Regions:
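Short FAD-binding loop at a beta-strand-to-alpha-helix junction that anchors the flavin cofactor
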Residues: 53, 102-132
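Mid-domain catalytic core of redox enzymes
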Residues: 1-66
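Short Gly/Pro-enriched loop/turn and capping motifs at secondary-structure junctions
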Residues: 40, 59-61, 89-92, 116-118
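Flavin (FAD/FMN) cofactor-binding core of flavoprotein oxidoreductases
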Residues: 64-111
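Solvent-exposed, flexible loop/coil residues
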Residues: 21-27, 43, 95-98, 120, ...
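Alpha-helical elements of Rossmann-like donor-binding domains used by nucleotide-donor carbohydrate transfer enzymes
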Residues: 32, 67-71, 127-130
Length: 135
């Protein structure tokens, strides 16, 4: 599952600006924290706020959203301004060589989307921003 959690910037001043954090320890329900408002050029949250995306694999938590919130508060800061489950997704999987095959295609058009730029939401958003800048 994917959660969004937002804070006033002063609440998370101790969290370094950056891409995010991987959490390999399976005792935590959160496997990764993406610093959404730090890594994207487009506005992700109001000024003086920071937005984080929490990646929560189903095999690492009991389905109780409070356990995710508690973990996030321990890792980031307490009392977030916003905490919401935004979806349940599975990362698409491709056979080895798929991206190389796509890169070698000769076409008269430009392809966009996760099937050609990468499967992470960050790749998709970066690609969308790149295309938007061309207009």
């Amino acid at each position: 599952s994917i959660f969004a959690i937002g804070y006033r910037s002063d609440q998370v001043a101790n969290v370094k600006i950056g891409y995010g954090t991987l959490i390999p320890d399976s005792k935590y329900p959160i496997s990764g924290i993406l610093h959404e408002s730090d890594i994207h050029q487009s506005k992700r949250c109001p000024e003086n706020y920071r937005l984080f995306r929490l990646m929560v694999p189903h095999n690492r938590w009991n389905g109780n959203e409070e356990s995710v919130l508690s973990c996030a508060e321990n890792l980031l800061a307490g009392n977030p301004e916003k905490f919401v489950k935004i979806g349940e997704r599975e990362i698409p999987r491709y056979k080895p060589g798929y991206m190389r095959k796509i890169a070698q295609m000769n076409t008269d058009c430009t392809y966009i989307g996760w099937s050609v730029s990468g499967v992470s939401i960050t790749h998709v958003i970066d690609e969308a921003e790149r295309i938007a800048e061309q207009f």
